[in-house]
Amino acid sequence: MNQQGTRKQENLKQPVVTKQQALRMLETYFGYTSFRPAQEAPIASLLRNEDVIGIMPTGAGKSICFQIPALCKAGLTIVFSPLISLMKDQVDGLLVQNIPAALINSTLTQAEFNKTMYEVRSGKIKLLYIAPERLGSNFFCNVLRALPIAQVIVDEAHCISEWGHDFRPSYRLIGEWLNSLPKRPIVGAFTATATKYVENDIKKLLGLNHANVYVTGFDRPNLSFAVIRTPKRMDYVVHYVRQHANENGIIYCATRKDVDRVYENLTRAGIKVGHYHGGLSDEVRREMQNAYADDKLQVMVATNAFGMGIDKSNVRYVLHYQMPRNMESYYQEAGRAGRDGAPAECILLYSGQDVQVHKYLIEQSIETPERQAVELRKLQSMIDYCFCSNCLRKYMLNYFGESTVWTTCDNCSSCKGSGDKVNVTKEAKAIFRAIMGTDERYGASMITSIVRGERTDRIMRAGHDALPVFGLLSDVDEKSIKGLIQQFVASGYLRSSTGKYPVLSLTAGAEEVLAGHKEVEEIRQHVSVPSRTSRSTSTTLRGKSSSGSGGLFEHLRQHRKRLAEKAGLRPYLIFPDTVLIDLANLRPTTLGEFGNVKGVGEAKLKKYGLSFLQAIAEYKG
């Protein structure tokens, strides 16, 4: 979807670039013969010297959207990026393709800074990655002001907004700096997740009210989604990771304590596992992140502090040990799976305790009642997702404002029908009558106590023990009733107010049930880990592998790992898994055949072609 802007800016004399020329750049440097559908329009806009906002899901190839224009334009492209590790990975990935790029952040010595700036001023660098914190220095701002800037790119642009899930105050410096320049350059802002609030902040704070806005669909068809409600989360996690022994995964936990618990259990199970949270030293976090990125660890257990700083494309699963606080965070974190476009799994393990933990954190960390109310509404949407009996993918897309013509995706736990439908109309009527009989003045805890027949002081004083529904569900445990209430909210039978003490009220749907016009069903899940052994990665990734290619794929992975260690690079920067899969399937024997593999550009062909051809020839499987 494009919202057309009108402003053009011509600061440097720019060449007219045709689509064919841009495609030649794409094939030469990146090894692809065509743009993805979402890439072509923002690339064309930047080449026409028009401001752009790109809201594109992880894995859609948003970096290409500004890297191709950077190669085509005269002058320098400045890229603002939030994390040092993310900058390094991206610059290393460009350098390995012979694209002149550099970075400036706090890790550089004065000598390294001077050398980099000399190369920039000499026109030897096309893309310069900068941490936005550097804009706090007047000296550095003056240095940048003298450069021939063709375009400025703001990556992870949601960081500029307090409405976003990863607000960084340093991003506010970018807009101020842009306004201070004698001539404003073309600006592109890119992010994987942005609600309308965040999008408006990006426009306002970066001066992009007239930008072309490209919103690519949030759907990631290669990702399967599941919600598992189980009290035995640890057993599930250990079993799952064992079943996926040859695959990379991330397990997110809400607290440091849970990170350590899961890490210790997986370590005892013999898994190559790392852990990452704010309680660890910078050195330990750096070591863990590097080991995971270099494929020395199979799985990383982490708080949400981990992830944005890593550009790892071959993550095959993301497990959430607890429910995240909101859908924005979940989409961002789950989206770290399958960035190479190959199938991956996103599984959320839910417990009612998660809700109380997040409510407490919201109340403790957010001061203003208005902001608390916003966060509590977001939390309720996350809870509704966990109890959604319809398509999870459709729910997620609708949350982000994207409509769908289909009702089922056949690739989520709801659509796959991983459970039995149980009629809970009796329980629903009891709960609805309790809410109606108390004039819709209470929340889930009080209603649960009433239908269970608990003679608390509060209930007795109010006379609620005289209600006809008092004790009607005395044989149902508290946890199950509260779970049903959450499901009824998610299904639209009940409304839950926001605020510190949410109050339940009936909708028209509940009134239909009470009138006997409608029955209510609950999905009772079968909680189990798929009984398959670890998936053959080649079969999983493409579904087109020939017999024996799985062994060759693993052989090529080990070869890539050795090359990466020798060069000091992340393995996936040499070639992503998807390229190795094609190599294992196609088994090229000449450089010409090797160069025809999608994702192999000229620079990588020259650097690694003969080495991989030899590895393929040596394989005896």
Question: What is the predicted role of each segment?
Answer:
Residues 370-400:
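Short, charged low-complexity linear segments at domain edges
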Residues 345, 395, 408-411:
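The −1 position to Zn-ligating cysteines in a subset of zinc-ribbon hairpins
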Residues 1-22, 375-376, 404-621:
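Accessory DNA-binding and partner-docking regions appended to nucleic-acid-acting proteins
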